[in-house]
Amino acid sequence: MKICGLEKFRVFLSLISMVSLLCNGVNGFTIVRSMAVNGESVPDRFSNPSCRPSDCALKRASTTNGCSTTRDCCSCQCSKTRATYLTSPFNRCTTSEYIDEDCSSFFVLPDDSPPPVADITKPGHINFFSETRCHKGLRTRSWSHSVDATSWTTGKPNGFSVELVEGSSSSWKWRLSWQNGMDAKFSGLIIKLEFSCQNTRSGCFLMKSKGNYTIPNSEQWPSIIPTDVSFNLTGENANPTANSGTSARSNRNEQNKMEEPARNQAELEPKKTGVVVAGVTVSLAAGFVLALATLLLMKKKQTSLAVNAKARPNSYLGYEEPVDSAGRPEQTATESPSFDNEFYTTDCVLSLSGNNVGGKVTRMGPLPPLPGEESIYAEPMIKRSVAYQGLAEKNKQQDAGTACNVQPQPECKVIEKTSNENSHDKGTDEDKG
């Protein structure tokens, strides 16, 4: 099966995503604050790196809702009475008294009622109640966010507004609104809104932002001891206020300090286990990615070799004699090997008609080429130097090349005169006389 480049890219992205999720699941710590369809708040859920039910119980999570719907207990859920999960120094599910202890009694929540959950990433509003009415001039002075309800960071911009809906002598209903959605980075945090009034009264209101908040590593944030001092936000001197339950909260803080070493020791073991699991998981994922990359490279190389082999010409095939099927239907064309011999040609092969005992066509080897037209043999002419005895001594000293060019002297013949010639000669003599 050929894997295209796009499929390789998708497989690679899937592997990277899987490794990232595994690493985040082990090294990260996630807090989920959610709400039901009808708008009611749902107890917080948080990740459990060790995936053991005993660790959920250690963090004061509900025994019935302590684990998620999966078989492994990798997600714990707080109970309704302890619906809010706080990080260090608590690191467990807590009640409302641990959250609103920094707020004065001007705006309060019902007893044992957790802070409401609101989605601040889009425009909306939420209603809350107070025991005291600000007659006029109530405004949202500032707002801040936190993950542990002890260290607060001022949030910007301030897009919250508050107005009175209705009230009576004992309870007043307010509406908190925000026209623009906030940044998604504030999801999963605890939001504190601080109000001021013209009659020098001040107070705050707490709510939880809907969404997930993930701590990048397994190390919890440093412990910050909460204070029992309430601040007057009207600009006057900040003095401690006699809030109800202050002494009881101080005792609980002291008790938490004493229980902190034991909790840290109990939480140290799952952290070590999580680090080991993270190392093994990353190693296995890296090995799997390496094996897959090697397999893909080998597959690509084999495909390239196959394509090159198909493109290469078949030079090893020999001469195949054409067969006339009409003249000799009983014979079939067979391949003959090529002969690499300087005295023969590869295109001249003798094929005998008829089959041998084995039923195969009888063939002979290549024939020598036919002789061409031969020329008539002519004996070469040999020129020799001949010396004649009658030559002068100086002719004998000439070289062989000059002697070859000497022509023999012509022979002299004596011709006898006839009778006619004699009479003619006599007449001539007489005339002369």
UniProtKB/Swiss-Prot annotation:
Cellular component terms per the entry's GO annotation: membrane
Keyword flag Signal: yes
Extent of Polar residues compositional bias: 235-250
Alphabetical UniProt keywords: Membrane, Signal, Transmembrane, Transmembrane helix
The name this protein goes by in its record: Uncharacterized skeletal organic matrix protein 3
Compositional bias (Basic and acidic residues): 251-266
Tissue-specific expression: Component of the acid-insoluble and acid-soluble organic matrix of the aragonitic skeleton (at protein level).
Membrane topology type: Single-pass membrane protein
Subcellular location: Membrane
Topological domain spans for side Cytoplasmic: 296-433
TM spans (from-to): 275-295
Membrane-side (Extracellular) residue stretches: 29-274
Segments of this protein annotated with the region Disordered: 235-266, 320-340, 413-433
Stretch forming the signal peptide: 1-28
